[in-house]
Swiss-Prot record:
GO terms for molecular function: DNA binding. This is Sugar fermentation stimulation protein homolog. InterPro entries: SfsA, SfsA_C, SfsA_N. Belongs to the SfsA family. NCBIfam families: sfsA (TIGR00230).
Length: 240
């Protein structure tokens, strides 16, 4: 996924009300940008962090700039929660995720479960349907260890239960964690942030839900889905 125009560098002043970020650009210009991330963004809100913004010329937008990347712990972190689904859609079209390659079609936002919409439904005439949920990961508290979630994630826990129900019916069910960081080489659930999610992930992984974790290649011009990363469901990735 290429950014539509070169990103603009600045420094974060503050992030507030979840969706707003005050930034000072490298040329000294202060501005308020849209922050496309409703989560806690632990470790990514620190004033003074270098950040990268995209700019839109759409006159209907209230804020022309969007916070896209933050430099933290020596690496780049993608904070836009819309990107993982776009990255996965791009990778599916290219057959770049071997574990779910070979399906004739994929549809997005298909209703299932308890009034939910699955991110992707993969279909082919010669194999069971594949229900695929995508989760964005940007938390790192120990060197190299990506964690999810960074706050209580009741909706994500419900998605795991719904995937397990699809697996019980004989379909494939997959949860794909997309790690939008360049400094992580493994993944574990953050049990201290949400013990129910961590327990549910371990449970559904034993009940037929496939767990995939992929890293990302990130720079100021583009984001690409990277290589698969190892994972475990121990939830022991808490800081000492």
């Amino acid at each position: 996924m290429d950014f539509p125009s070169p990103l603009i560098r600045g420094r974060l002043v503050s992030r507030y009300k979840r969706f707003f970020a005050d930034v000072v650009l490298d040329d000294g210009t202060p501005l308020t940008a849209h922050c496309p991330n409703p989560g806690a963004m632990l470790g990514l809100n620190t004033p003074g962090l270098t950040c990268w913004l995209s700019r839109s010329d759409d006159p209907k937008r209230k804020l022309a700039h969007t916070l896209e990347l933050v430099e933290a712990d020596g690496g780049l972190v993608g904070i836009n929660t819309l990107h993982p689904n776009r990255l996965v859609a791009e990778a599916l079209a290219a057959g770049a995720i071997p574990e779910v390659a070979g399906y004739a079609s994929h549809r997005r936002e298909v209703r299932y479960g308890e009034n939910s919409r699955v991110d992707f439904l993969l279909e082919a005439p010669d194999r069971p349907r594949c229900w695929l949920e995508v989760k964005n990961v940007h938390l790192m508290r120990q060197p190299g260890l990506a964690e999810f979630p960074d706050c209580v994630a009741a909706r994500s826990t419900r998605h795991l239960r719904e995937l397990a129900a699809m697996a019980a019916q004989g379909d494939r069910a997959v949860v794909l964690f997309v790690v939008q960081r360049t400094d992580c080489d493994r993944f574990s659930p953050a049990a201290d942030c949400d013990p129910k999610f961590a327990a549910a992930l371990a449970e559904v992984a034993s009940a037929g839900v496939e767990v995939l974790v992929y890293g990302c290649e990130i720079d100021a011009a583009r984001v690409r889905l990277g290589r698969p990363l190892p994972w475990d469901t121990s939830g022991t990735g808490r800081p000492a």
